[in-house]
């Protein structure tokens, strides 16, 4: 009987579309098994499962999970099992005056974008510490670096992601676990659906690269960071076409 070689597994949240889906496809091509999570887009995430298993020959599990709910996250961690790479990508946005924002919506943004990192990492990190290896990549935003008018909750959540990344990296470096983040500028995802074509054209004029970034480029940056030497940790890398 042949010996089955255990492949490494990547857990990706917000994996049904956008940056998460692009990262899943790219990691599958490099031979990682996948555990893909999204809140409700079951059809979309199962398409990625079928595609990656067929084209890359890897194992891909999927699960619906609201990462803002610690009870659901516990079930997710149990089902995921061994995780070697964790990509915290799930996020929501809110555009509007801070004074018009409801308390419920504030908590939704903070719980999804920031608190979810704590809920997930507190369950996944112990196994990484036992193995003395692991990689955590948090998807952040330039608004976490400088803040954005009309996006106070989103900016605050991503600023928290940046600090969470730097602090956890110091905590886990002795266990040879890398923790990094990418602060993306404008990437071509569903987060832009609220903007008109005219608004997007004006936004592009502000970006020296004269365009918005693609999810493929975002995934390439994520994978390059995941391949970086183990001494590379605690970094928040900005990728924004020279914008901010």
Language model segments and positions:
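Conserved glycine-rich cofactor-binding loop
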Residues: 16-17
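C-terminal substrate-recognition "lid" of short-chain dehydrogenase/reductases
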Residues: 133, 211-239
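Short, small/polar-rich loop/turn modules that mediate ligand/substrate recognition or access, typified
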Residues: 173, 178, 232-234
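Alpha-helical segment proximal to the catalytic Tyr-Lys
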Residues: 126, 170-174
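Active-site helix of classical SDR
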Residues: 121, 157, 165
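Substrate-binding pocket helix/loop in short-chain dehydrogenase/reductase
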Residues: 97-98, 105-110, 199, 203
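Residue(s) in the substrate-gating loop at a strand-loop-helix junction
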Residues: 141
């Amino acid at each position: 009987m042949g010996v089955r070689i255990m492949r490494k597994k990547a857990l990706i949240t917000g994996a049904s579309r956008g940056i998460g889906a692009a990262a899943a496809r790219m990691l599958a091509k490099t031979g990682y098994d996948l555990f893909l999570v999204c809140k409700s887009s079951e059809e979309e995430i199962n398409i990625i499962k079928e595609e990656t298993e067929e084209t890359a020959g890897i194992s891909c599990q999927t699960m619906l999970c609201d990462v803002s709910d610690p009870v659901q996250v516990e079930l997710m961690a149990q089902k995921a099992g061994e995780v070697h790479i964790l990509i915290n990508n799930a996020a929501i946005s809110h555009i509007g005056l801070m004074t018009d924002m409801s308390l419920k919506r504030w908590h939704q943004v903070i719980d999804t974008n920031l608190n979810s990192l704590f809920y997930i990492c507190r369950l996944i990190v112990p196994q990484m510490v036992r193995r003395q290896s692991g990689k955590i990549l948090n998807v952040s935003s330039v608004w976490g670096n400088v803040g954005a008018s009309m996006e106070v909750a989103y900016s605050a959540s991503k600023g928290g992601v940046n600090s969470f990344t730097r602090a956890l990296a110091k905590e886990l470096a002795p266990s040879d676990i890398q923790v990094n983040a990418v602060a993306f500028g404008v990437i071509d995802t569903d987060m832009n659906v609220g903007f008109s074509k005219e608004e997007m054209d004006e936004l592009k004029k502000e970006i020296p690269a004269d365009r918005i970034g693609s999810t493929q480029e975002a995934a390439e940056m994520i994978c390059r960071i995941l391949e970086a030497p183990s001494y590379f940790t605690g970094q928040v890398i900005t990728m924004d076409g020279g914008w901010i």
